[in-house]
Amino acid sequence: MTEPLILQPAKPADACVIWLHGLGADRYDFMPVAEALQESLLTTRFVLPQAPTRPVTINGGYEMPSWYDIKAMSPARSISLEELEVSAKMVTDLIEAQKRTGIDASRIFLAGFSQGGAVVFHTAFINWQGPLGGVIALSTYAPTFGDELELSASQQRIPALCLHGQYDDVVQNAMGRSAFEHLKSRGVTVTWQEYPMGHEVLPQEIHDIGAWLAARLG
């Protein structure tokens, strides 16, 4: 497995953001975003893991970096839950590794774009039991959130920021909104923000993420 890209802050780290890229991208995809955020988050380390390369069914079996196989796109995503679980376990291991460096779990954040965001949702609100600084979900969905979703007390205390394009034709806006509503209805402090964009990231969105992180890091 490719080692994560680790961006150290200007000052000794006392917080961390673990940021997962989307389908077909790599660990360098969000490096410019992380570097921009570190200009104001002077004590925040960024960890950018790399998805394994695997065949992706919806792309004709072509091999590409992917956190899990996507078998069908509509009417709802059909995915490999087994591979999703493996990826979520990887994120859990990264959280534990950051804790061993001395960073408190309450100052560790999970962020993910598109497919990476789905892994982040699953890790934080299905698998992880304990405090976390928060979740940042960009242009994503939650394939394992259903009507039966039950959150523990610690999971309910994990704040979340959901950001989505109004014109996203890859992960429809309604799919992201559904994840937001699932969390909101279960008592999570969750914020929904829309932008006039497609399946992408805008400078204003990055600014808003920086402000959200700064407010929680003090």
Curated annotation (Swiss-Prot):
GO terms for molecular function: carboxylesterase activity. PANTHER family: LYSOPHOSPHOLIPASE-LIKE PROTEIN 1 (PTHR10655:SF17), LYSOPHOSPHOLIPASE-RELATED (PTHR10655). Hydrolyzes carboxylic ester bonds with relatively broad substrate specificity. Belongs to the AB hydrolase superfamily. AB hydrolase 2 family. This is Carboxylesterase 2. It comes from Pseudomonas fluorescens. Disulfide bonds: none annotated. Pfam families: Abhydrolase_2 (PF02230). It catalyses: a carboxylic ester + H2O = an alcohol + a carboxylate + H(+). The active site is at residues 114, 168, 199. InterPro entries: AB_hydrolase_fold (IPR029058), LYPA1-2/EST-like (IPR050565), PLipase/COase/thioEstase (IPR003140). The gene is estB. Homodimer. Its EC number is 3.1.1.1. Keywords: Hydrolase, Serine esterase.
